[in-house]
């Protein structure tokens, strides 16, 4: 499976939360230094979340994204606060290979579908953040009235390929991922490139997700807290299925891929 380390950013610093609660913020240092550390260890992908952006409903930490994409060769997906066409283009121009969007697919479905058509399914990741079976939005501060099943049904049928699913009650707890939830998604949508997120607390959790047939996993706090080690043995299991490379935007069209 594909291993995807995560960097969450608040006020330009690398942080982790527990269950999306901003009051539980723990600071781990500089995002660029952490990204370079992941690259030095042999990682190829990176998931970057602008938590300030998610909370304020517009992209905030674009400078941190730009620094990472400029000074590393990591393939970066970026999310958090992407609500407008300008936000999306800004993220791509700052070097994001993919952009994760979730709230907009709830609040403005036509805009998400327009992006899907314009930029293509390979350039977007649908963020499916779930709490008690319902999709949450805006930095997990609000619960929508949309069930996860209905959310996925609509957008997989529309051509979505990549889904990042976070079980909010597990996120940052290190108590283990929601494997049964992810298995149920894969059973219904075997064509989905599902990225599991939330709860990973050990190497065994990663191996369990791999055994369950989950294509990719995001992890963060488990690494920062020393619960998992990016050992050569684990890195050998990193099957890079993403074929995305960093692309440039010219007049809102993708070039130089």
Name each model feature, range by range.
Residues 2, 22, 71-78, 121-125, ...:
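Short beta-strand/loop segments at the ligand-binding rim of alpha/beta enzyme cores
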Residues 8, 38, 46, 91, ...:
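Conserved, mostly hydrophobic/aromatic
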Residues 11-12, 16-22, 96-171:
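Conserved anion-binding
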Residues 45-61, 103, 165-175:
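Glycine-rich, proline-tolerant flexible connector loops at the mouths of alpha/beta enzymes
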Residues 52, 60-117:
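Glycine/small-residue-rich loop that forms an oxyanion/phosphate-binding "nest" at active or ligand-binding sites
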Residues 72, 76-98, 180-216:
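Catalytic cores of alpha/beta
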Residues 90-111, 167-169, 198-205, 212-232:
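Glycine-rich phosphate-binding active-site loops on the catalytic face of alpha/beta enzymes
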Residues 238-257:
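Short, basic, low-complexity termini and linkers enriched in Ser/Thr/Gly/Pro
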């Amino acid at each position: 499976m594909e291993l995807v380390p995560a960097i969450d950013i608040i006020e330009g610093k690398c942080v982790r939360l527990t269950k999306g609660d901003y009051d539980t913020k723990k600071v781990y240092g500089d995002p660029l230094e952490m990204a370079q550390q992941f690259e030095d260890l042999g990682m190829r992908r990176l998931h970057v979340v602008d938590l300030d952006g998610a909370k304020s409903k517009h992209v905030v930490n674009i400078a941190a994204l730009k620094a990472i994409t400029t000074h590393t060769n990591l393939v970066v997906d970026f999310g958090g606060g992407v609500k407008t066409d300008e936000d999306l283009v800004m993220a791509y121009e700052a070097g994001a290979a993919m952009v994760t969007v979730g709230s907009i697919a709830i609040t403005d479905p036509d805009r998400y579908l327009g992006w899907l058509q314009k930029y293509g399914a390979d350039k977007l990741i649908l963020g499916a953040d779930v709490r008690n079976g319902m999709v949450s939005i805006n930095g997990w501060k609000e619960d929508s009235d949309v069930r996860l099943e209905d959310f996925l049904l609509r957008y997989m049928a529309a051509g979505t390929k990549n889904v990042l699913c976070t079980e909010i009650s597990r996120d940052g707890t290190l108590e283990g991922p929601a494997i049964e939830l992810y298995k149920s998604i894969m059973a219904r949508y075997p064509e989905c490139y599902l990225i599991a997120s939330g709860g990973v607390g050990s190497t065994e959790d990663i191996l369990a997700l791999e055994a369950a047939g989950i294509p990719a996993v995001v992890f963060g706090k488990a690494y920062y807290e020393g619960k998992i080690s990016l050992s050569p043995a684990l890195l050998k299991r990193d099957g890079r299925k993403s074929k995305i490379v960093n692309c440039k935007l010219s007049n809102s069209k993708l070039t130089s891929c």
